[in-house]
Every structure is written in structure tokens, then in C-alpha cells.
């Protein structure tokens, strides 16, 4: 679980039924998930990047730029069964002091797909402040929360064979 104000990722221990710190600092982590190999995938608002925590605890930067421009504030993330990583990148984490970092975005709000080779593509560019995202159980639909306009909405996209939406 991410604890953005305390710059921490927390770990739940089922045996003791308590949380403990897994990583601090976490670069103001937000969205977390596991890849198909069980490694932790982290959206880091503060460092403006998507990372993977390896089994030995080291951190691999998966993506911090798109077309030579720095990401905004990766927000939420899901991994598809083909090992591609899909994540939202709204500017929202850079536009207020909640994360402690305020600056102008270099990119518009996007949803990205990062394939196993490390190639990234924009899969949604028409969403104002994309936030949470999830696949349908058969992975044929991608659901994305649009956070930036009222009323907030849930967008649904078809996912096509090449992994795009």
C-alpha cells in the first residue's frame, strides 16, 4: 500500500495483522501492482517514473520519459497477461503540493502501454486526468477513470489484438 504523504510503501503481514514499512523513501509512490513474476511495479509521482522492484530489492526504472520528455506523475498501473504494463500518467500529481513537487508538465495526460521489450505507446490521449484503470476478466476491455471533469466518468475501451485499445 502506498502512503503518499509519508513517502512510503507499506507491507501487510497477515500473521501479525500489522503494517510495516517496505520502502522509505518511495518517491511518493502511488499505484502498485505485481507483474506476472511477482515483482512489485510502482508508479512514482516524485521521481516521475515507473519502476520494478527486483527480488533482491534493487529497483529497475522501466520508464521515465516518452519521446524524450519526462513523464508527469504516473498514477495507477495494471499488468496484462502478455506481460505488458499499462499505466495512467496525469499531470495532477505535479500541479499541487500534495506530493511536495510542483512544476509544469512536459507531456499531456496519457495512458501508456509498455511492452516486454520496453517499447511504449500511448493507448489513450483523450482522457482528462486519467486515474485508475483495470481490465475486464477476459482482458478484452480496458476501464479507465476520468478524474478531471465533473461528473467523473468511467471510460471503457476495446483492447485489440496488438495490445492497443
What do these predicted regions represent?
Residues 1-165:
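Sequence-structural signature of mature extracellular/luminal beta-sheet repeat domains
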Amino acid at each position: 500500500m502506498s502512503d503518499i504523504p509519508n513517502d512510503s510503501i507499506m507491507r501487510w503481514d497477515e500473521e501479525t495483522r500489522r503494517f510495516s514499512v517496505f520502502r522509505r523513501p518511495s518517491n511518493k509512490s502511488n499505484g502498485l501492482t505485481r507483474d506476472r513474476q511477482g515483482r512489485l511495479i510502482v508508479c512514482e509521482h516524485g521521481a516521475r517514473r515507473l519502476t520494478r522492484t527486483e527480488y533482491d530489492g534493487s529497483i529497475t526504472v522501466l520508464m521515465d520519459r516518452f519521446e524524450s520528455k519526462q513523464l508527469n506523475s504516473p498514477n495507477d498501473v495494471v499488468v496484462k497477461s502478455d506481460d505488458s504494463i499499462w499505466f495512467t500518467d496525469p499531470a495532477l500529481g505535479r500541479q499541487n503540493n500534495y506530493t511536495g513537487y510542483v512544476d509544469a508538465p512536459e507531456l499531456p495526460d496519457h495512458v501508456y502501454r509498455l511492452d516486454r521489450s520496453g517499447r511504449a505507446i500511448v493507448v489513450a490521449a483523450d482522457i482528462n486526468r486519467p486515474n485508475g484503470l483495470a481490465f475486464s476478466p477476459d482482458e478484452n476491455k480496458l476501464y479507465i477513470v476520468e478524474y478531471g471533469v465533473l461528473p467523473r466518468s468511467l471510460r471503457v475501451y476495446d483492447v485489440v489484438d496488438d495490445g492497443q485499445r
